């Protein structure tokens, strides 16, 4: 058991044993945080946060994780804030960031950006989200949340609701689930937002049992977990298509009337109108706890990727 050093580009690069080891280290980080223990694992390290697409939770949780470990950050929050706006090519920007830091976390609206950056950089690169492709560290948090709430992932019945076509969080979440043995996975969306064929084929190839449906109410009473995503407005090339689908699903108090007692809702956030604000106050809402776990999980990830963890 252990966790490989180096780039974090796809959750498919990790085994179940790798992920479970990451969760154990995250548990230890969570304990340190609760004890207000000052850590020095990243003393002398600089983490570059190259966020060329808007972010709140991912960027700030990586920044907080770095600070909590004793490191420092360089933050680039948009293309306009760097020499990219002056015409500098992307490769030169990555080489510059690589020379200034010990690790790069990168987010971009373009698929494949993180992998290309990793080919250029000598230091590790972490994919903070690349277009509709993947968001591996969010999936690690999602899996860790279920691990914390249920004591494991095997045997759970999981529903995934919303924009299955464009949401990179769903792609990585499904890829992560292939490393475990959930009882069943329901993919819940209208045909226009159906999971992309290449993702569907990949999870089938990896042995994940799933069923597609358009009706949440037909399956919600079976679920242990409902993973909800917003409609990805920024990924829609056609605004008319977005207008057609933006309000197709909404979780209300009434939606939850027959759910299991232990049922929980996850959401990678931000949520817009897809969950009624009154649901936030119910015991079913686990998404704020999920967001809170982002810091200890990313603390664990940084310490393992950089090889400074000595647990």
Curated annotation (Swiss-Prot):
Enzyme class: transferase
Binding site for carbamoyl phosphate: 57-58, 107, 135, 138, 269-270
Pathway annotation from the record: Pyrimidine metabolism; UMP biosynthesis via de novo pathway; (S)-dihydroorotate from bicarbonate: step 2/3
Keyword line: Pyrimidine biosynthesis, Transferase
Sequence positions that bind L-aspartate: 86, 168, 230
GO biological process: 'de novo' pyrimidine nucleobase biosynthetic process; 'de novo' UMP biosynthetic process; amino acid metabolic process
Reaction equation(s) it catalyzes: carbamoyl phosphate + L-aspartate = N-carbamoyl-L-aspartate + phosphate + H(+)
Domain of life from the UniProt record: Archaea
A GO molecular-function descriptor: amino acid binding
InterPro entries, A to Z: Asp/Orn_carbamoyltranf_P-bd (IPR006132), Asp/Orn_carbamoylTrfase (IPR006130), Asp/Orn_carbamoylTrfase_sf (IPR036901), Asp_carbamoyltransf (IPR002082), Asp_carbamoyltransf_Asp/Orn-bd (IPR006131)
Enzyme nomenclature, EC number: 2.1.3.2
Pfam families: OTCace, OTCace_N
UniProt-listed PANTHER family: ASPARTATE CARBAMOYLTRANSFERASE, ORNITHINE CARBAMOYLTRANSFERASE, MITOCHONDRIAL
Sequence similarity: Belongs to the aspartate/ornithine carbamoyltransferase superfamily. ATCase family.
Subunit structure comment from the entry: Heterooligomer of catalytic and regulatory chains.
Function text: Catalyzes the condensation of carbamoyl phosphate and aspartate to form carbamoyl aspartate and inorganic phosphate, the committed step in the de novo pyrimidine nucleotide biosynthesis pathway.
Protein name listed in UniProt: Aspartate carbamoyltransferase catalytic subunit
Native organism: Staphylothermus marinus (strain ATCC 43588 / DSM 3639 / JCM 9404 / F1)
């Amino acid at each position: 058991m252990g966790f490989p050093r180096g780039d974090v580009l796809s959750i498919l690069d990790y085994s179940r044993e790798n992920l479970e080891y990451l969760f154990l280290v995250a548990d230890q980080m969570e304990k340190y945080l609760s004890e207000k223990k000052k850590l020095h694992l990243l003393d002398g390290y600089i983490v570059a946060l190259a966020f060329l697409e808007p972010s709140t939770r991912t960027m700030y949780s990586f920044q907080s994780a770095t600070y909590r470990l004793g490191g420092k950050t360089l933050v680039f929050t948009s293309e306009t804030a760097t020499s990219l706006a002056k015409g500098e090519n992307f490769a030169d920007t990555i080489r510059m960031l690589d020379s200034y830091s010990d690790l790069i976390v990168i987010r971009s609206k373009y698929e494949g950006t993180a992998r290309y950056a990793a080919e250029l950089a000598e230091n590790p690169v972490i994919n903070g989200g690349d277009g509709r492709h993947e968001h591996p560290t969010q999936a690690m948090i999602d899996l860790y949340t279920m691990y914390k709430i249920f004591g494991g992932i095997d045997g759970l019945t999981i529903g995934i609701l919303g924009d299955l076509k464009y949401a990179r969080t769903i792609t990585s979440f499904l890829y992560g689930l292939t490393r475990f043995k959930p009882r069943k996975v329901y993919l819940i969306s209208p045909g226009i937002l159906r999971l992309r064929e290449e993702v569907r084929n990949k999870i089938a190839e990896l042995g994940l049992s799933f069923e597609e449906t358009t009706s949440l109410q037909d399956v919600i009473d079976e679920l242990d977990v409902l993973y909800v995503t917003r409609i990805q407005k920024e990924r829609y090339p056609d605004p008319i298509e977005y207008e057609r689908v933006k309000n197709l699903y909404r979780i209300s108090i009434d939606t939850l009337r027959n759910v299991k007692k232990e049922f929980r809702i996850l959401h990678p956030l931000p949520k817009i109108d897809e969950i009624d604000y009154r649901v936030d106050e119910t015991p079913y809402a686990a998404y704020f706890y999920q967001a809170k776990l982002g810091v200890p999980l990313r603390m664990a990830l940084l310490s393992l990727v950089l090889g400074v963890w000595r647990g």
